[in-house]
Amino acid sequence: MSGNSIFSRFATWLASPEVFGSITKKIPGNWQLYEYYVDLEEDLIHLGEADLKSNNELLHIQFEEDEQFSLNEQLPLPVFKKLKLGQWSVHRNFITLIDPSDFRNNLEFQFAFQKNDLKLLKKDKTGKIEFFGFFRSEKSEKAR
């Protein structure tokens, strides 16, 4: 019985994001922004789900299994304005959105998963938060 419990915990760990390479398996899919923070002129601004709806703001990112992505956004932020399609790449806890035509438009985010939600964090060189967003997958949206 004890061996069975250890085996099930080991199997669970193998499927978890802590195992090298398995975290990229959680990324592919359609992700919808439902909350974000941005640091504007020394003020940390927070917009929740109701704020996004009332302001008609949206950000939808589709990550394909072949490491392509597409982005649809209507946000009053300059972060995503120059990049709509490209490739994505993961190294440790960073995801890079790569512009195939101009590397200067590449975007790098720290990312994490919590309760099946995707968190993306982008800071500038001084540590100021340019974007800290929380995303739900369409799968979890349909389950609601």
PLM regions with names:
Residues M1-R144:
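Lipid interaction determinants
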